Each structure stands twice: as C-alpha cells, then as structure tokens.
C-alpha cells in the first residue's frame, strides 16, 4: 500500500510542508535577529521577568532570552511560557494602601473640623444667651439710669459743689499758666537753633553735595546697567542650553524608536496585550520596573512554542518608583529578599569549599553567621563520624 503512487505523493507533500514551515520559521527568527542587530538591541541578563495589570493581576514570564536597547526604550523577550498568579501586584497594593490611608486621614480631619465648628457655635450661642439674659446687667443699667435722672435737692450738697469747683478752677489756671510759659520758651529756642543749623548746613551741602552726587550717580548707574544686562543674559543662555539638550535627547530617542518600530512592523505583525501595564525585571539584586508599559506579541508564521514579546518603555528603579507613590513606604520585603539571596550565595560558596578535596573543614566551620548550617542533617552526621 505504501508503494502506491498516491501514497508516495501524499508522503512527499507532508515532508515538503514540514520542510517549508521549518524554513519559514528559521527565516523569521533570522530576520528578527537582523533587526535587533541593526538597531543595537543587545543581550540583557535578568534573573526573572513578570508583567502586571492596573488591577494587580500578575503574569510570570519564563524567559529564555532577553534583548534590549535602553536608549530606544525597547526590550525583546523570548518566553518559553507565561502563567498567571492570584497574588496582587505589590505596586498596586502600595498605591491602594496610600489612597485608603489618605482617605482615612481626610475623613478624620473633616470630623475634627466638624466637631470644632460645632463647639464654636455652641460657645457663641451660650455667650449670646448670657449677654441677653443676665439679671445683674439689667439691674446695673437701671441704677445708672436712675442716678442720671435724680436731681440734687439738699443745700449742703450745693455748697460742697461750689467749694469743689472753686478749688479746681484755681488749680487749673495755675497749671495752664505754667505750661504756656514753658511751651513758649521751648518754641523760641528750637526755632533759633533750627535756623542757625539750616543756614550753616545749606552752605556746606551745596558745595560738597554737587561733587559727591555726580560721582555716586554715575557709579551706581553703570553698575546697575551692567548687572541688569548680565543676569538675564546668563539665565536665558542656561535655559536655552537646557531646552536644546532636552530636545536633542527626545529627538534622538524618538528617532531610534521610530526607526526600530518601522523596521519591525514592516517585517512582522504585532498583537497588543492591553492587560500588561507594568513590566518588572530583576538584574542581580536590583528590581527594575517599566511604568505604563506597552507590550506587543510578535506573531510568528508558522506559530512557535516560544512567545516573542516586545516591551516598550523606560526602565527605572523599583524602590525609587515606590517612594514616588508613597514616601513613607518601607522596603522591608525588598530587604528581606536581598538578605535571603545573599544567604543562598554564601551557602553555595561554603559548599564549593567543602567539596574541594584539599580544603576539608570541620562541621563547626560550615555554620553561617546567622546560626544556620549549609549542610543537611545527614551530611553533618557523616562529617562528625569521619572526625
């Protein structure tokens, strides 16, 4: 049956199809490599990669190869698998906690101000009530009115009033005479002194003033003109230089990015992944993040097992980005992860030393600084038996 002509034709056509698909795939991979090489998208080394949405859904990326150009803000990731997690992304959690804390603080401040306003209103109402309903105040007002209306009827009171008025008149006349004499003498002395001083000063000022004023006015005018012209010129030059530098950087970045995107769009079809708004990588012990990342999937024809991702955005330090969101954020989780990583490195180094035949150490030497051992319980017991 296999020797029949129709079966041979079918078998050959299948082989040709497989061969054609493999050729097309290798051609597409070669074109992608050529585009990356042309635009200086070089190899990058990251420990892990993950993506997240604004809602906090996390997708972990098992990457086989990463390439990028930080100047263009472009990263190409070859991923063997992408799987999602139920955990909420820590950046989203920090932002939500900050918003909730701010709302709580605003509510507390609003309640405090509300209570203070109510307290002030009550105090004002009490003050108004006391002012309007004070019986002692009314009694005092009535007594004062009665005293103003009462007329003096006794002769003894009239005589005492006349004596008091005579004494007061004599005292006032004596005081006024003395004060008028003192004032007239002071005025005359002041006038004569002022006239003599004015005459003497006018003559000296007219001679020396003309010369000094001309010199000072010329100097001050020249200095003010120089300062006023130099300061705005320097400031304008600084501003123009900064603006030009920023424009050049933006133009260069846009130029490199435009050329890369033009090339890759002409050779591949790109599929947008709108759910991936954050892209995070770990380089050694440093976490880096792209905020508002734009992630495309490079569609390969025929489809491959690997997924090629194109990530667009500027990398920045995750710690500084989190401090921008919440200045009070404490990097406890990051510090914990870094210490665990350093402990693992120390353990690996200790194991390498133990495995070498020349350096045979005692079990006490294989204990780390924090008290944990780098060996398992079985290995530890074996070393004790050998010793």
Curated annotation (Swiss-Prot):
Cysteine pairs bridged by disulfides in the record? none
Keyword Coiled coil (UniProt): yes
List all Basic and acidic residues biased stretches: 204-213
- Spell out the residue ranges making up region: Disordered: 1-23, 146-255
Provide ranges: composition bias, Low complexity.
162-175, 182-194
Q: Which UniProt keywords apply?
A: Coiled coil
Q: Where is the composition biased (Polar residues)?
A: 214-231
Coiled coil ranges: 98-129
This one is known as Uncharacterized protein R604
Q: What is the lineage of its organism?
A: Viruses, Varidnaviria, Bamfordvirae, Nucleocytoviricota, Megaviricetes
């Amino acid at each position: 049956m296999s020797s029949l002509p129709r079966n041979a034709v079918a078998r050959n056509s299948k082989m040709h199809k497989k061969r054609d698909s493999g050729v097309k795939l290798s051609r597409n991979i070669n074109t992608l490599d050529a585009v990356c090489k042309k635009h200086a998208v070089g190899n990058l080394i990251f420990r892990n990669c993950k993506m997240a949405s604004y809602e906090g859904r996390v997708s972990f990326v098992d990457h086989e190869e990463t390439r990028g150009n930080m100047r263009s803000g472009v990263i190409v990731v070859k991923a063997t698998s992408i799987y999602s997690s139920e955990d909420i992304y820590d950046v989203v959690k920090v932002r939500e906690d900050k918003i909730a804390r701010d709302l709580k603080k605003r509510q507390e401040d609003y309640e405090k101000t509300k209570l203070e306003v109510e307290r002030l209103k009550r105090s004002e109402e009490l003050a108004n009530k006391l002012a309007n309903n004070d019986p002692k105040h009314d009694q005092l007002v009535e007594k004062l009115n009665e005293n103003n209306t009462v007329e003096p009827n006794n002769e003894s009171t009239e005589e005492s009033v006349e004596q008091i008025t005579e004494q007061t008149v004599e005292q006032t006349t004596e005081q006024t005479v003395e004060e008028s004499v003192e004032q007239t003498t002071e005025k005359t002395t002041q006038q004569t002194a002022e006239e003599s001083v004015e005459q003497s000063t006018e003559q000296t000022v007219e001679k020396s003033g003309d010369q000094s004023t001309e010199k000072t006015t010329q100097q001050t005018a020249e200095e003010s003109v120089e300062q006023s012209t130099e300061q705005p010129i320097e400031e304008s030059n600084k501003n123009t230089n900064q603006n030009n530098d920023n424009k050049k950087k933006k133009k260069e970045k846009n130029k490199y990015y435009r050329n890369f995107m033009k090339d890759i769009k002409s050779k591949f079809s790109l599929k947008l992944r709108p759910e991936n708004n954050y892209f995070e990588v770990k380089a050694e012990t440093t976490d880096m993040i792209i905020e508002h990342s734009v992630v495309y999937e490079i569609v390969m024809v025929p489809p491959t097992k690997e997924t090629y991702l194109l990530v667009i955005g500027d990398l920045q330090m995750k710690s500084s980005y989190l401090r921008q969101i919440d200045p009070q954020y404490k990097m406890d989780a990051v510090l914990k992860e870094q210490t665990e990583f350093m402990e693992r490195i120390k353990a690996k180094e200790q194991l390498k030393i133990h495995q070498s035949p020349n350096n045979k150490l005692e079990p006490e030497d294989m204990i780390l600084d924090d008290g944990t051992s780098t060996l398992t319980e079985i290995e530890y017991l074996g070393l004790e038996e050998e010793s």
